[in-house]
Amino acid sequence: AADVADGLDGAYEPLAHARAAALRGQILALMGEVSGDIEQILEAVTCLADVVEDLARDHSPLDWARMQAALGLALQILGEATAGERAFEQAVTCYERAGLVLADAPALALRAEASNGRALCLARSAELSGDLAVLDAAEAAFKIELAHRRAGVDPVSWALAQVNLARIYEARLDITGKDRGERASAALALQAALDVFAEEGLRSFTLIAIDAMERLRVRAVPRDGV
């Protein structure tokens, strides 16, 4: 990927050059995740950030969204490797930017990945900081999204918001160690999402919701709050 990117002139072939450079960044991020090499992950983040900066959104909105999501994932990997709250916050921004473009592509698997990544990074940021206010804000945002999207009009977006809301409930369980109804609320949201994904025949989305249901199933039952 590096050789291909180096062999392309970004001035004359900006999109091809951006795609090759982004692929290199994605490979570096995944290699760094497997090896635990933080320097390699940082190199991936820098590479992808440069690509995103150089490629205009209007040139190819879908490619721009893919690269924003790729940068989000690289930052997410960096956050996990370093327990860095700031990396997760930056990843959320990237996923949100990607989501703005992908909102009109309900069947695109990347949309599910970006939406799920955003929720995961919000939750991880809150878990690292222990700041329940972050979760409160995220929960409110997802509830507003649910209020604005009707299941019958835009079922996929509605179901994705349900999955994200469930992830926030999970994070609250992890942080507080108490169940004040979050487990049941998460299960209810995930089941609603699963029903939609199954009806729409969206396998990749269904797997995300099933994984979340499995996490709830095996999670140790926290003590009840008072």
For every predicted segment, state its role:
Residues 21, 39-46, 65-68, 86-93, ...:
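Short, charged, amphipathic alpha-helical segments
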Residues 1-5, 24-25, 44-51, 70-74, ...:
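Tetratricopeptide repeat
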